[in-house]
Structures are given as structure tokens and as C-alpha cells.
Amino acid sequence: MKRLALVLALLTVSGLAHAKKTCTDQPKEKWMKEEDFKKRLESEGYKIRKFKQPGSCYEIYGTNKEGKKVEIYFNPVDGTVVKEVVE
């Protein structure tokens, strides 16, 4: 019984870790336009391989100005980084 409880607890924590990020609670009317945001990132040296809009975030997969692979979640209203993974 203890083993089952442990497995269920681990699955619950694992599920929470993979939940979508909340980047903003602002309505989409206040978000930057995707094309304008992409241009801004490219002007900062990012090369965008994939651009997504999961939930309330803008997310990119690509490389930064140093050429390192990145996965970054941005607040689509002001462009701040919410989460960044650099390989």
C-alpha cells in the first residue's frame, strides 16, 4: 500500500512539473504581434528554428547570439523571459 501511495505521489509531482507555463494573464489584444516579436528576437541575435504559442506564452527553439541551442518561454506582453534552457 505504501508503495502505491509513493508511485501516485511521484506521478502527481511529475505531472505538475510538465504543466504549461503561465507567462501572462493579459488578454491577447495586449500581446505583441508574433511577427514583430520574432523580428525583435532576430535583431538581438537569436536564430529561431521553431516558434510556438503554448497557453499564455511565446516559446522559441533555436540558437542564441553565442550559437548555443535554446528553449525560451517569453511573456508575450512585454517580452520578458519566463524560463530559459540553454544547452
Segments predicted by a language model, with ranges:
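A short, surface-exposed interaction/processing loop segment used at functional sites
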Residues: 81-87
